[in-house]
Amino acid sequence: SQIGNTPLVRLKQASELTKCNIYGKAEYFNPGESVKDRAALYMINSAMENNKIEKGGTVIEGTAGNTGIGLAVVCKEYGLKLKVVMPNTQSEEKKITLKNLGAELIEVDAVPYSNSNNYVKLSKKIAADLSKENNHGVFWANQFDNLDNTKAHIETTAEEIWKQTAGKIDGF
């Protein structure tokens, strides 16, 4: 996979100001140019390993951007369809990127989470409705509550940082 194994970059000004070596993880080297690519890959791999979805299946997610882009990168590679439910207030650049990566956009009004028409709640409903008619599986990524989102960083990002620093870390 082209996702992960990103370099550490020493942040010169922060290091000089603190008299410590401060590093940042250059996640912009991922194909979707974001740390969210890791979470997307991990969530999709887990869903496939647990037979929640297979090639030809559909991933649904409510997202305002970067997780959707990460999912689009992974779905395109794995032969999965992606439907992204997003607030219509998002930038045209994000929308174009998602469409260019093959995602189907479902734009909705931006409303509070408490509203039943919130983009996250609508994505859950769409996934439930679609699962009744899809033979290859429908996977609601559910990034906000999906523990694989966090595990991605425990099992990949943290491991990489540990190796790249030879275990010499004073703070995280």
What are these regions (language model features)?
Residues 1-172:
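PLP-dependent amino-acid enzyme catalytic core
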